[in-house]
Amino acid sequence: MAATLLARACGLVRGAPWPWGWRRLHTVYQSVELPETHQMLRQTCRDFAEKELFPIAAQVDKEHRFPAAQVKKMGELGLMAMNVPEELSGAGLDYLAYSIAMEEISRGCASTGVIMSVNNSLYLGPILKFGTKEQKQQWVAPFTSGDKIGCFALSEPGNGSDAGAAATTARADGDSWVLSGTKAWITNAWEASAVVVFASTDRSLHNKGISAFLVPMPTPGLTLGKKEDKLGIRASSTANLIFEDRRIPKDSLLGEPGLGFKIAMQTLDTGRIGIASQALGIAQAALDCAVTYAENRSAFGAPLTKLQAIQFKLADMALALESARLLTWRAAMLKDNKKPFTKEAAMAKLAASEAATAITHQAMQILGGMGYVKEMPAERHYRDARITEIYEGTSEIQRLVVAGHLLKSYRS
């Protein structure tokens, strides 16, 4: 699969550039020399996003429509299982490759980016790390092709950031576990064929009593809530999962009883690299849009790009974007080298998400009234960016993580 993915780098045909929103990148990646394989991957993903995602992004956003055909094609390219070993039908690539691909896909369509991110890092990731050989065959291999996707159920209506306070319970009963409770804000909920769900097996132990389970979808005893009508990433479904005495086999347990909180936290570390990369893609798309518009729009007898006020905005946007990209790549490379990366992933996610929010804001400002209408992609980028500061750990949580590691390093 990895060989197929990289071979196609030279096979996709470039489309014509679009007038508002897609600019060829010439210097953005020159700050770090990427390996040739990663450069090929980047070009493959960029061409795919240009050809398959950018043209449909506005429509799927408007219709709240899951991009099923595009996700299937991404599966064929290996993008839905990038870090899965080839023996399990994955691409067998590293996390730097995953970050690069996530940015390019999200640059074309942020909704498609988060669909890809959840399947790769939140669903497949914990099963690869903590699952048995049998679980990997059952729950990983069928989810690599784009035909099936998974989701991740940690948050609840009464808790989001406090993951250890799960009200959902899993009760042992003979050869089964019985799940009861409601999970909230579940990305991919309506399209998913399986979920990694976290529930309390011993409430007296708080986070040490949380366990993780693998559950097929749809299934009796599991009801989907309504699709949330969201501000952004509207082509990706978000809904509650309601478990009503859902009975699952004992071998549905992922890892050991009480290991769920550790599984969740380690999974979110990797997920934050994915969301940081999604934010980079949104920010890059907004910068593309702003520069294209400013070069073609005249004021006071000259293009907007001749105005110092606009140049200052563009400089600040580029600075924030490239700084966040380097932090994100650093976190990915630390993970690839099996070094601690929790702090760096939090820094990357914080920097990239806040950069995306700021850059999309300034892009709208540069476009003026044209940035406020749906004929231009700037308003969609603005809407899509906001969630990156909330899901997979709010900006406030990221600051707590960074500060905790910083203070610990000074005290040691």
Swiss-Prot record:
PROSITE patterns xrefs: ACYL_COA_DH_1, ACYL_COA_DH_2
Pathway note: Lipid metabolism; mitochondrial fatty acid beta-oxidation
**Chain positions with N6-succinyllysine modification:** K51, K129, K262, K306
Activity across pH = Optimum pH is 7.1.
**Which Gene Ontology terms describe the biological processes this protein takes part in?**
butyrate catabolic process; fatty acid beta-oxidation using acyl-CoA dehydrogenase
Q: What is the predominant subcellular site recorded for this chain?
A: mitochondrion
> Can you tell me which residues form the catalytic site?
E392 (proton acceptor)
Swiss-Prot/TrEMBL keywords? Acetylation, FAD, Fatty acid metabolism, Flavoprotein, Lipid metabolism, Mitochondrion, Oxidoreductase, Phosphoprotein, Transit peptide
| Residues where substrate binds | S161, D269, T270, G271, R272, G393
Which reaction(s) does its UniProt entry say it catalyses?
a short-chain 2,3-saturated fatty acyl-CoA + oxidized [electron-transfer flavoprotein] + H(+) = a short-chain (2E)-enoyl-CoA + reduced [electron-transfer flavoprotein]; butanoyl-CoA + oxidized [electron-transfer flavoprotein] + H(+) = (2E)-butenoyl-CoA + reduced [electron-transfer flavoprotein]; pentanoyl-CoA + oxidized [electron-transfer flavoprotein] + H(+) = (2E)-pentenoyl-CoA + reduced [electron-transfer flavoprotein]; hexanoyl-CoA + oxidized [electron-transfer flavoprotein] + H(+) = (2E)-hexenoyl-CoA + reduced [electron-transfer flavoprotein]
What is any one of the record's Gene Ontology cellular component terms? mitochondrion
Q: Which residues carry this modification: Phosphothreonine?
A: T27
Q: Which residues carry this modification: N6-acetyllysine?
A: K51, K72, K129, K208, K262, K306
Q: Which cofactor does it need?
A: FAD
Q: Where is the transit peptide?
A: 1-24
- Mention one GO molecular function: short-chain fatty acyl-CoA dehydrogenase activity
- State the EC number(s): 1.3.8.1
Q: Which family does it belong to?
A: Belongs to the acyl-CoA dehydrogenase family.
Function of the molecule: Short-chain specific acyl-CoA dehydrogenase is one of the acyl-CoA dehydrogenases that catalyze the first step of mitochondrial fatty acid beta-oxidation, an aerobic process breaking down fatty acids into acetyl-CoA and allowing the production of energy from fats.
Record-given protein name:
Short-chain specific acyl-CoA dehydrogenase, mitochondrial
The scientific name of the source species is Bos taurus (Bovine)
